[in-house]
Amino acid sequence: RMWGAFGNKPVDADSCEVISYKTFTDPGPQQFSIVHAIRVAKDGMVYVADREHRRVQSFTSDGKFVKQLAKTDQIFARDLAFSPDADQQFLYVGYNKGVAVVDRKSLEYIGTIQPAGILGAGHHIQTDSKGNLYIAQTTAGMQRLTYKGMSN
């Protein structure tokens, strides 16, 4: 089964106009623009990074829309990765010059990992079993951010 944003029937790419992120009104465009990543969690939930519309949407495995997180202030939704814990509690999302940390189930934005002067345009994200983040950048190779635990 194919589906578009909000679980809508997708339309041909030629008719999906890219709308400036500054013009968004809630809930946003009814179709995806550039789907830059799709990830399926262990519980079967599907997460879609719609880069040009600067949002992440979650769906059931049969295409029913569940939630959306849009961050229109900066470049958002370049890539997606799950935390390695059994529940995959966190969703990591490429965000401007860092990585947004999001509660996976609620899609609540928690914060951004953005070490000073280290990250460029993070384009692909992956985690390992220890919680380390690996970030491939468009202009500066790859970096590993070592997991040292959660802080307040």
Model-flagged regions — what are they?
Residues 119-152:
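Blade-level signature of beta-propeller repeat domains, shared across WD40, Kelch, NHL, RCC1
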Residues 1-17, 66-71, 110-114:
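Beta-propeller fold detector
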Residues 60-64, 103-107, 146-150:
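Short loop/turn segments that connect beta-strands within beta-propeller blades
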